Amino acid sequence: MNTTAIRKFRDKLSADQPVYGLWVTLESPSITEMAVALGLDWIVIDAEHGHLDWRDIVGHMRAVVRSDTIALVRIAELNGALIKRSLDTGADGVIVPLLVTNCCVPFW
């Protein structure tokens, strides 16, 4: 988790500044390396619809280390093990699809 990048991201949002990012569905971390080189604010690694395995996700996380780009992982479903594993790879956050309210989210 990159707290400096998260702080910069939140500051931009608080100041109503636009944030730019990329939705990643490909296995190659070269895509993420390009996003970092372009100075994008965020990437989302799509583990719901993409054909990514955990090795691919770790490769993308390595590409954002020590950058100002935050990395989020979108998992396939509300599942504590998937959330924990995503965070263990170094994700700055997790996107859980198909949640209408936070009433369905247990606290782990």
PLM segments and residue spans:
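Expand to "…catalyze enediolate/carbanion chemistry for C-C bond making/breaking, isomerization
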Residues: 1-108
